[in-house]
Amino acid sequence: MERLSERLAVARKALATLVEAIRERKTPLNRDASIQRFQYTYETVWKTAQNYLSVVEQLTLGSPSAVIRGCFQAQLLDEEQSRSALRMAQDRNLTVHTYNEALAEEIYARLPGHAQLMEEWLKAMDARMTSATS
């Protein structure tokens, strides 16, 4: 559980850097930096969820999509959040394979929603851990 608590703390810090970037004035440099922060925040959050599912729910899942589905089954995410999380996973994959200006703009526009979803996801894990240890 201690390792999971550490992962949650790291994920919250990563998310804070994304939120900070999103709040800045939009420039091409800030857009690209925000997308980069989204990439590492997403990676940190889904891997934290993977660890949570393993430790707390005894589910061993390997891919981001499987972890998202597992979080839905464990009721950490509702149906709408799960669909949004799968879309977020697609956005993350699109950001790393090629650079496309129009795509960067589209993904940048979705970052506030992605950040909100990751915040809710982390809060759900925090709440479950708190209730499990009390």
Regions found by a protein language model. Name each.
Residues M1-S134:
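Solvent-exposed interaction patches of small proteins and small membrane subunits
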